[in-house]
A protein has these predicted regions:
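Conserved N-terminal segment of class I S-adenosyl-L-methionine
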Residues: 1-91, 253-260, 268-270
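A conserved beta-strand element that flanks and buttresses the S-adenosyl-L-methionine
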Residues: 103
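Short catalytic micro-motifs in class I SAM-dependent methyltransferases
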Residues: 106-110
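A short glycine-rich, Lys/Arg-flanked "PGG" loop and its adjoining helix->strand segment in the class I
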Residues: 115-130
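Conserved class I S-adenosyl-L-methionine
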Residues: 132-159
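A C-terminal cap/extension of S-adenosyl-L-methionine-dependent methyltransferases
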Residues: 149-150, 183, 194-271
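Acceptor-substrate binding/catalytic loop of class I
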Residues: 164-180
Length: 271
């Protein structure tokens, strides 16, 4: 499949079922994580309703883990995972070295005690295994809005308050640099092979604005149980054309979020 065809497949998969802010963010993440080779068995931590997993694992994954029982019901209906478990990622019910690959997309920033989860990933991942994750980074709040415009209007105080509200509403606990995240991984034996920023300032602004464009999606979810009750209105060439540039944009020098690809060291981590 060509890169252009891959982008269209990913965008359409999200446009059929997700509000616009998730379409932008998740499509970029799906493109990045789809480029990784995952030996089996695969564990997806924070699998949620299974939609993202169905996009990056078109042939299915082995195990999905999430504490949200309602989300797991949706994931079960999709049939992406051979096994689903509602468990705490900081105390996973799996034997050591059970998996050859672990994936966790846009989950870590929502977990207060993230060190416990990272240690558990190192435990259940076999030596040489692949670990791939995406997180929000140190530039997330900075790039989310046009800070200069707020400052010109004399609204620096309200702007700070708005960002605090937005991150509280989004349940964000961690806004760390690549070095801080890398140190966390390396301490438990997850060796960082490469990392990259994504979601440039321009894409971050579009992601932010689309939260408010997506308010009708929220109403639809509450009324019908679906974010997109009429997929033909969004899953079409017009919206693919409008959003493709965010998914295909080159790696930015600095971005709102960070993707990491790691491998599990065979030797014990240095204490």
């Amino acid at each position: 499949m060509s890169p252009a065809d891959s982008t269209e497949r990913i965008l359409r998969a999200h446009l059929r079922e997700m509000p616009f802010h998730r379409v932008i963010m998740r499509s970029i993440e799906a493109r990045i994580l789809s480029e990784v080779s995952y030996p089996r068995p695969i564990l997806d931590i924070g699998c949620g309703d299974g939609h993202f997993g169905s996009v990056i694992f078109p042939e299915g994954a082995d195990v999905g883990l999430d504490p949200g029982i309602a989300d797991l019901s949706e994931a079960r209906a999709r049939g992406t995972y051979r096994l689903l478990t509602g468990a705490d990622s900081g105390a996973m019910p799996f034997r050591s070295a059970a998996f050859a690959s672990v994936v966790s997309n846009c989950v870590f920033e929502h977990i207060p005690n993230i060190d416990a989860t990272i240690a558990e990933i190192a435990r259940v991942l076999r030596p040489g295994g692949v670990f791939a994750t995406t997180v929000i980074g140190e530039h997330f709040s900075e790039f989310l809005t046009d800070e200069k415009a707020w400052r010109r209007l004399g609204l620096s105080g309200p702007h700070r308050a708005y960002l605090e509200w937005f991150n509280h509403k989004s349940v964000h606990f961690h806004f760390d640099s690549p070095q801080v995240w890398s140190d966390r991984f390396e301490r438990v034996g997850l060796q960082v092979q490469r990392w990259r920023y994504y979601l440039s300032p321009g894409a971050a602004h579009a992601f932010h604005r689309s939260h408010y464009v997506s308010l009708p999606h929220l109403a639809a979810k509450r009324l019908t149980g679906r974010w997109v009750p009429f997929p033909a209105l969004t899953d079409n060439a017009f919206w693919v054309g409008r959003l493709r540039r965010f998914v295909d944009e080159p790696e930015p020098e600095a971005g709102s979020c960070i993707a990491f690809i790691c491998t599990r060291r065979a030797d014990p981590p240095v204490k």
